[in-house]
From Swiss-Prot:
Belongs to the LipB family. One of its GO terms (molecular function) is lipoyl(octanoyl) transferase activity. Pfam families: LplA-B_cat. The active site is at C168 (acyl-thioester intermediate). Catalyzes the transfer of endogenously produced octanoic acid from octanoyl-acyl-carrier-protein onto the lipoyl domains of lipoate-dependent enzymes. Lipoyl-ACP can also act as a substrate although octanoyl-ACP is likely to be the physiological substrate. Its main location: cytoplasm. The record marks K134 as: Lowers pKa of active site Cys. It catalyses: octanoyl-[ACP] + L-lysyl-[protein] = N(6)-octanoyl-L-lysyl-[protein] + holo-[ACP] + H(+). Substrate binds at R70, G71, G72, Q73, V74, T75, F76, H77, S137, L138, G139, G150, L151, A152. This is Octanoyltransferase.
């Protein structure tokens, strides 16, 4: 339904089943399907985007590497990171891909601002940064005018696996997280703020929250 949004809180999930579910949702949706945002916390995994190069995998060790069809290069997902998958009909919302990327970046910037953290986007490297350290990664895929994949915001996680890769293809890219910046360390304190900021930017009028048990 237009101007309506469903928020699904999926809890902690492995990456591959969630990826498959996104594909199924996107393939089966119709022009009347309500847009959704999925909130999830993944078990440790490296994901390679469509532009991913093996030389950016430095020492993955025992953490699995999964090929993904999102844009971008390699990143890490793990507990303590808020992942939001943005499953919306761009044509119905009259959005271009660049518009959506900008909206997502501004959603994160506005969310961090609510917690007293000043951040910015960069024209040369999608995502959100605090003092040149990356706090949020972003990667999307568009199919039949609809988006899937989304953002990964570091809240309170083990950042050391990022040292095993060149994050998003940038050697030496430093990472940071909200808990290191005097922000909250609990995902459930950040999720509603992120959703509120996203719905304001995309002008949704009706929001339904669904929490799914693991």
């Amino acid at each position: 339904m237009q101007n309506s949004l469903i928020i699904r809180n999926l809890g902690r999930q492995d990456y591959e089943p969630t990826l498959q579910a996104m594909h199924e949702f996107t393939d089966q949706r119709t022009p009347e399907t309500t847009d959704e945002v999925w909130l999830v916390e993944h078990n440790p995994v490296f994901t390679q985007g469509q532009a991913g190069k093996t030389e950016h995998l430095l020492n993955t060790g025992d953490i699995p590497v999964i090929q993904s069809d999102r844009g971008g290069q390699v990143t890490f997902h793990g507990p303590g990171q808020l992942v939001a998958y943005v499953l919306i009909d761009l044509r119905r919302n009259k959005l271009g891909v660049r518009d959506l990327v900008t909206h997502i970046e501004n959603t994160v910037i506005n969310t961090l601002s609510q917690f007293g953290v000043e951040s910015n986007a960069r024209p040369d490297a999608p995502g959100v940064y605090v003092d040149n350290k990356k706090i949020c990664s972003l990667g999307l895929r568009i199919r039949r005018g609809c988006s899937f994949h989304g953002l990964a915001l570091n809240i309170n996680m083990d950042l050391t696996p990022f040292l095993r890769i060149n994050p998003c293809g940038y050697a030496g890219m430093e990472m940071t997280q909200l808990a290191l910046l005097s922000g909250p360390s609990e995902l459930n304190k950040v999720q509603p703020v992120l959703v509120e900021e996203l719905t304001k930017l995309l002008a949704y009028q009706s929001i339904e929250w669904i929490t799914e048990s693991n």
